[in-house]
Amino acid sequence: MNRLKEKYLKEVVPALMSKFNYKSVMQVPKIEKIVINMGVGDAVQNAKALDNAVEELALISGQKPVVTRAKKSIAGFRLREGMPIGAKVTLRGERMYEFFDKLVSVSLPRVRDFRGVSKKSFDGRGNYTLGVKEQLIFPEIDYDKVNKVRGMDIVIVTTAKTDEEARELLTLLGMPFQK
């Protein structure tokens, strides 16, 4: 079993139970899924850019991403409905815990001038969103093979009802929030 999941079951659950006075273990918030989305705007002119993004996302997440397509046509961006413009991955279960562990312990500390992630990025329903400016912070990405620096959005979906509960859950799991 993953070390982060073990930590969740042995330390985080009892801590949250006592802090929020839950009656049942099933009320304790947990991470449901992590969605990683990479928008590739230049895929409109350059089809190879999307292939590279898909490949990098597969390396980072450990599973094959799904290609996202444009919902609407936008003439200003020379975009037609149905054109591929990005890639996303939804992680659950073991892979999700592995990715979160890697993100918190390896990748985020590698960000330049890192002072912690924003406390304001909760959506009011207990989910947390985080933007990463470059894919190079992940250890799987080989610096020499990168042809373009791409960012991504990482959404951590929890079963928490409020932002306060979600913040406490993520803090106990090791998320480095700003002081």
Curated annotation (Swiss-Prot):
One of its GO terms (molecular function) is structural constituent of ribosome. One of its GO terms (cellular component) is ribosome. Keywords: Ribonucleoprotein, Ribosomal protein, RNA-binding, rRNA-binding, tRNA-binding. Pfam families: Ribosomal_L5, Ribosomal_L5_C. InterPro entries: Ribosomal_uL5 (IPR002132), Ribosomal_uL5_bac-type (IPR020930), Ribosomal_uL5_C (IPR031309), Ribosomal_uL5_CS (IPR020929), Ribosomal_uL5_dom_sf (IPR022803), Ribosomal_uL5_N (IPR031310). It comes from the Bacteria. GO terms for biological process: translation. Gene3D superfamilies: 3.30.1440.10. Part of the 50S ribosomal subunit; part of the 5S rRNA/L5/L18/L25 subcomplex. Contacts the 5S rRNA and the P site tRNA. Forms a bridge to the 30S subunit in the 70S ribosome. Belongs to the universal ribosomal protein uL5 family. This is one of the proteins that bind and probably mediate the attachment of the 5S RNA into the large ribosomal subunit, where it forms part of the central protuberance. In the 70S ribosome it contacts protein S13 of the 30S subunit (bridge B1b), connecting the 2 subunits; this bridge is implicated in subunit movement. Contacts the P site tRNA; the 5S rRNA and some of its associated proteins might help stabilize positioning of ribosome-bound tRNAs. This is Large ribosomal subunit protein uL5.
